[in-house]
């Protein structure tokens, strides 16, 4: 159920740079961040067990991305601090959709593409964080009646996602051991440690995929 969620400036991605590969400004999202825009930019992030939802309204010309770590916070009360809850998909998706609506998007026109939910580390398989995130994002969007146009979820690999909100194009690179996955593995181990010491574990189209060896394009 959508609520009146305020904008969260502290959670808006601020890492901007010029991407020479795509010849345009890029915004890099870290975990617990989101970004919405009407500009012709590329939004990028790297995912392990985390999930990103890329949502846009083609008619309104606005789109955005988020990056969340866990499905839901069942222990959160009504007085929760939203600025510390963007790690949870329930809040991250709520904020993203509400910000798009504020920019002129219409709920019935929203289109989503979702990525991530990988089991990057062997010891993470028992926690099923990636699977839970993947299940959650699909269930949430179905409940909110947001059409999922494409998905690349689960599996044993990390992903680098580049999303163009103006056109809806999503490029997904499935990272291999030859790619730089050190940062991802560090984050996954930290998440695994945090969950293993917690008294409560979290509750249970069209994409272009490319690796260093091969590139496959599926029409958008």
Swiss-Prot record:
InterPro entries: CheD-like_sf (IPR038592), Chemorcpt_Glu_NH3ase_CheD (IPR005659), Cytotoxic_necrot_fac-like_cat (IPR011324). GO terms for biological process: chemotaxis. SUPFAM superfamilies: CNF1/YfiH-like putative cysteine hydrolases (SSF64438). Disulfide bonds: none annotated. Its EC number is 3.5.1.44. The keyword Cell inner membrane does not apply. It catalyses: L-glutaminyl-[protein] + H2O = L-glutamyl-[protein] + NH4(+). GO terms for molecular function: protein-glutamine glutaminase activity. Keywords: Chemotaxis, Hydrolase, Plasmid. It is an enzyme of class 3 (hydrolase). Pfam families: CheD (PF03975). Probably deamidates glutamine residues to glutamate on methyl-accepting chemotaxis receptors (MCPs), playing an important role in chemotaxis. HAMAP family: CheD (MF_01440). Belongs to the CheD family. PANTHER family: CHEMORECEPTOR GLUTAMINE DEAMIDASE CHED-RELATED (PTHR35147:SF2). This is Probable chemoreceptor glutamine deamidase CheD. It comes from Cupriavidus metallidurans (strain ATCC 43123 / DSM 2839 / NBRC 102507 / CH34). The gene is cheD.
């Amino acid at each position: 159920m959508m609520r009146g969620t305020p904008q969260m400036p502290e959670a808006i991605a601020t890492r901007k740079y010029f991407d020479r590969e795509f010849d345009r400004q890029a915004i890099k999202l870290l975990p617990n961040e989101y970004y919405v825009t009407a500009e012709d930019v590329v939004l990028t992030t790297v995912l392990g067990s985390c999930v990103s939802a890329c949502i846009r309204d083609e008619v309104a010309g606005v789109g955005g991305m988020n990056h969340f770590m866990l499905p839901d916070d069942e222990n959160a009360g009504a007085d929760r601090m939203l600025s510390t809850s963007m790690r949870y998909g329930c809040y991250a998706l709520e904020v993203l959709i509400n910000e798009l609506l504020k920019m002129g998007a219409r709920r019935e026109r929203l289109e989503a593409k979702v990525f991530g939910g990988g089991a990057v580390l062997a010891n993470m398989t028992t926690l099923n964080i990636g699977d839970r995130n993947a299940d959650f994002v699909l269930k949430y969007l179905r409940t909110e009646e947001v059409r999922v146009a494409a998905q690349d979820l689960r599996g044993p690999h990390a992903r680098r996602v580049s999303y163009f909100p103006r056109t809806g194009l999503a490029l997904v690179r499935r990272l291999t051991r030859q790619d730089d996955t050190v940062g991802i593995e560090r984050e996954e181990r930290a998440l695994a440690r945090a969950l293993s010491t917690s008294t409560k574990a979290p509750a249970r189209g069209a994409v272009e995929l490319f690796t260093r060896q091969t590139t496959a394009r599926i029409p958008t």
